[in-house]
Amino acid sequence: MAMPKLTYEEAGVNVQEGQRAVNLMKESVKSTFTKGVLGDIGGFGGLFALDPREMEKPILVAGTDGVGTKLKLAFMMNRHDTIGEDCVAMCVNDILCQGAKPLFFLDYIATGKLKAEVVAEIVQGIANGCKKAGCALIGGETAEMPGFYQKGEYDVAGFTVGMVEEKNLITGKEISQGDIMIGISSSGVHSNGFSLVRKLFFEDKQYSVDQYVDGLGETLGEALLRPTKIYVKPILEVLQQEKIKGMVHVTGGGFYENIPRILPEGIDANVHLDTWQAPPIFQFIQQEGQIEQDEMFSTFNMGIGMIVVVERSAGEKVVQLLQELGEEASIIGEMVRGSKQVVLCQK
């Protein structure tokens, strides 16, 4: 008896559904295109033309990241239109810390069974993030991998390249005693600490994502899924007017792991806890989980998504500039003699 002929679709890969996803996302992708983009959607590689007249000695800065287990929350809520924005934010905010202006972005989406509408929603979020960052979405990969992911789940990762003038590269090496830290508010939990959050709320406490929380003024799911803020445009505007010595994207590891990444030898960062109040979502997490302060600051951004370090004399002006650009910003600490430690203290 002849064996039935096997097809790729019978093995779990639907090429037609993949093409339908491409068709659904085309307009979103094209809406991000900037003057440097060459070619159209569907090429083997994304093309981007650098303008050599823009900088004397341009340095390319690259970054890659994902969204982590915040994706699980998107699955629980069956909402996929913001998680792509998180992915862009995690990448572009990182390269921004070295003064780089993002030029272009590529994405990677992998799932067990491809649903064109879900992929299109994810890409819409990526496109929204790219537009907020002023960069172009020039390529990506959507992988259907049967048997690899749980039903209805997927993973998202991104990659970005930006450019900075060599003399304007920000490394933190110039940070010195007396410099001050300016904290710029986050939009919420951003994209870190979700393994703790999910265990606390949805395993231990048995909350629902649809549960309204009085202290938050919204459902728990809405508060947690809010996209990571993208700081590119306000920071680049500040850099046109003032010198920034160092920048910290407060992500995984919170204050304790991220601030030391820019500290030179012989310097500590004193963070003044009485200069801002952690937003309600962090107070709720700490209260419900009976979590120690150090653990909170080791895990979450605590309401501060980006920190910039400037000379003390420029502090008030930079704060004012950021506020004029629509950001909540304040001086939250200073650099002192030490050994590359982060010290939580009162002003």
UniProtKB/Swiss-Prot annotation:
The keyword Transcription regulation does not apply. Gene3D superfamilies: PurM-like C-terminal domain (3.90.650.10), PurM-like, N-terminal domain (3.30.1330.10). It is an enzyme of class 6 (ligase). Keywords: ATP-binding, Cytoplasm, Ligase, Nucleotide-binding, Purine biosynthesis. It comes from the Bacteria. Its EC number is 6.3.3.1. The keyword Zinc does not apply. One of its GO terms (biological process) is adenine biosynthetic process. GO terms for cellular component: cytosol. Pathway: Purine metabolism; IMP biosynthesis via de novo pathway; 5-amino-1-(5-phospho-D-ribosyl)imidazole from N(2)-formyl-N(1)-(5-phospho-D-ribosyl)glycinamide: step 2/2. InterPro entries: PurM-like_C_dom, PurM-like_C_sf, PurM-like_N, PurM-like_N_sf, PurM_cligase. GO terms for molecular function: ATP binding; phosphoribosylamine-glycine ligase activity; phosphoribosylformylglycinamidine cyclo-ligase activity. It is found in: Cytoplasm. It catalyses: 2-formamido-N(1)-(5-O-phospho-beta-D-ribosyl)acetamidine + ATP = 5-amino-1-(5-phospho-beta-D-ribosyl)imidazole + ADP + phosphate + H(+). It holds the Pfam family AIRS_C. Belongs to the AIR synthase family. This is Phosphoribosylformylglycinamidine cyclo-ligase. It comes from Alkaliphilus metalliredigens (strain QYMF). The gene is purM.
